[in-house]
C-alpha cells in the first residue's frame, strides 16, 4: 500500500511539474509576444520623445517585475502542494490572471502606450478612409450611386422642399388677399 501511495505521489508530482512547466512556457510566450508587439508599435510611432520611450520602458520593467513575482508565487504554492498542502489549480490560474492584469495595467498606463495606441488608431482610420474611397470609386465605375451622389440628391431634395414650402406660403397669401378683396 505504501508503494502505491508513493507511486501516486510521484505521478501527481510529475503531473504538477508538467502543468507548471506548460504554464510557465505559455506565460513566457505570451509575455514575449506582448513585448514584441509593444516594441513594434513603439517603432511605428515616430513622434515619440526619448522621455516617453523611457517612461514606456519603465512601465515594461514594472510589468516584468509583476510577472517575476507571479512566478515566485507559483513556485511557492507548488512547493506547498509538494509538501502536502491542498492547493487548487484555480489558485495557480488566478495567480497568472491577476498578474497579467496588473502587468498590462503597468504598461497601458504609460504615455508611450497611449502614443502607440493613438498611432494605431490613426493608421486604422486612414486605412478605413482609403477603403471607403476605393469602394466609392468602384461604385462610380460600375455606374452605381455613390455616397456622394446620394448626399447630393438629399441636399437637392431638401432645397426643393424648402422652395415648395415658400411657394405654398406665397400662394396662401395670394389666396387670402383675393378672398379679402372679393
Curated annotation (Swiss-Prot):
PHB and PHBV are desirable bioplastic due to their biodegradability, biocompatibility, and mechanical properties. However, PHBV has better mechanical properties than PHB. It is an enzyme of class 2 (transferase). GO terms for biological process: poly(3-hydroxyalkanoate) biosynthetic process; poly-hydroxybutyrate biosynthetic process. Keywords: Acyltransferase, PHA biosynthesis, PHB biosynthesis, Plasmid, Transferase. Disruption phenotype: Depletion of both phaC and phaE genes leads to complete loss of PHA synthase activity and PHBV production. Pathway: Biopolymer metabolism; poly-(R)-3-hydroxybutanoate biosynthesis. Its EC number is 2.3.1.-. Belongs to the PHA/PHB synthase family. This is Poly(3-hydroxyalkanoate) polymerase subunit PhaE. It comes from Haloferax mediterranei (strain ATCC 33500 / DSM 1411 / JCM 8866 / NBRC 14739 / NCIMB 2177 / R-4). The gene is phaE.
Amino acid at each position: 500500500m505504501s508503494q502505491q501511495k508513493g507511486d501516486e505521489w510521484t505521478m501527481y508530482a510529475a503531473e504538477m511539474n508538467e502543468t507548471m512547466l506548460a504554464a510557465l512556457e505559455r506565460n513566457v510566450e505570451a509575455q514575449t509576444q506582448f513585448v514584441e508587439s509593444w516594441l513594434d508599435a513603439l517603432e511605428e510611432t515616430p513622434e515619440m520623445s526619448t522621455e516617453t520611450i523611457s517612461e514606456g520602458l519603465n512601465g515594461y520593467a514594472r510589468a516584468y517585475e509583476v510577472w517575476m513575482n507571479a512566478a515566485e508565487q507559483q513556485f511557492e504554492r507548488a512547493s506547498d502542494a509538494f509538501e502536502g498542502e491542498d492547493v487548487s489549480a484555480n489558485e495557480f490560474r488566478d495567480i497568472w490572471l491577476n498578474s497579467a492584469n496588473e502587468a498590462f495595467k503597468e504598461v497601458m498606463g504609460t504615455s508611450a502606450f497611449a502614443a502607440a495606441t493613438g498611432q494605431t488608431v490613426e493608421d486604422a482610420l486612414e486605412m478605413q478612409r482609403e477603403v471607403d474611397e476605393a469602394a466609392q470609386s468602384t461604385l462610380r465605375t460600375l455606374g452605381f450611386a455613390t455616397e456622394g451622389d446620394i448626399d447630393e440628391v438629399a441636399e437637392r431634395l431638401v432645397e426643393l422642399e424648402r422652395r415648395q414650402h415658400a411657394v405654398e406660403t406665397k400662394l396662401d397669401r395670394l389666396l387670402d388677399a383675393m378672398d379679402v378683396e372679393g
